[in-house]
Design a protein with these regions (language model features):
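Short, surface-exposed, charged/polar-biased interaction segments
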Residues: 24-27, 34, 70, 135, ...
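Generic detector of short, locally flexible boundary/turn motifs and exposed helical patches
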Residues: 1, 8-13, 95-97, 110-116, ...
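Metal- or metallocofactor-binding catalytic centers and their adjacent structured scaffolds
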Residues: 39-126, 136
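Catalytic pocket of metal/acid-base enzymes, prominently hydrolases
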Residues: 122-148
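Proteins with a high burden of low-complexity, intrinsically disordered sequence enriched in S/T/G/P/A and R
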Residues: 12-22, 58, 100-102, 139-148
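Structured beta-strand/loop patches that form or line metal/cofactor-binding pockets in enzymes
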Residues: 1-59, 65
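Broad gene-expression machinery/nucleic-acid interaction feature
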Residues: 29-31, 113, 146-148
């Protein structure tokens, strides 16, 4: 099991929203696809994410540093202990290799967007909704009765 490609593209939001300090007319967002070699219905399982409607696209850092680090890693080093799925924490650790301590604001959106796409792929490979995968991983499998 391996990640075969990670693609990022910037798209304009094309929004006319504005307030007294900011407008979105030039705002862009990064859209990411994490493409795996796991096949479902004849197509590779892919995880998707976008960065935010309040942040500009951040693909330069993704393409220069974070995507190459993931794609050049030993594929087995990115898997969970069972070897049946990816481990988002291990992928995060690969992205953070050779990054200096601190300075997280510059990279947080780029890394976070890739990480969300990885989680989406993990849930699809597991054949479960992402909220269930997260509950199993971080809340002893307990789903909240309500969110708010």
């Amino acid at each position: 099991m391996r990640i075969i490609d990670i693609r990022e593209t910037a798209i304009p939001l094309k929004s006319k929203l504005a307030n007294s300090s900011f407008d979105f007319t030039e705002m862009t967002t990064s859209v990411v696809a994490v493409i795996t070699d796991v096949m479902r219905d004849g197509r590779p399982v892919s995880g998707f994410a976008f960065n935010s409607t309040g942040r500009y696209a951040c693909g330069a850092a993704m393409r220069a540093r974070f995507i190459p680090r993931i794609l050049s890693a030993d594929p087995d080093a990115l898997l969970d202990d069972s070897g049946d799925n990816f481990d988002p924490a291990k992928i995060f650790a690969q992205m953070m290799r050779r990054e200096k301590a601190g300075g997280h604001s510059e990279r947080s959106i780029a890394i976070g967007t890739i990480e969300v796409a990885v989680w989406d792929a993990v849930a699809k490979i597991a054949g479960k909704p992402l909220h269930r995968v997260l509950a199993e991983r971080f809340n002893n499998g307990k789903l909240p009765d309500k969110v708010f």
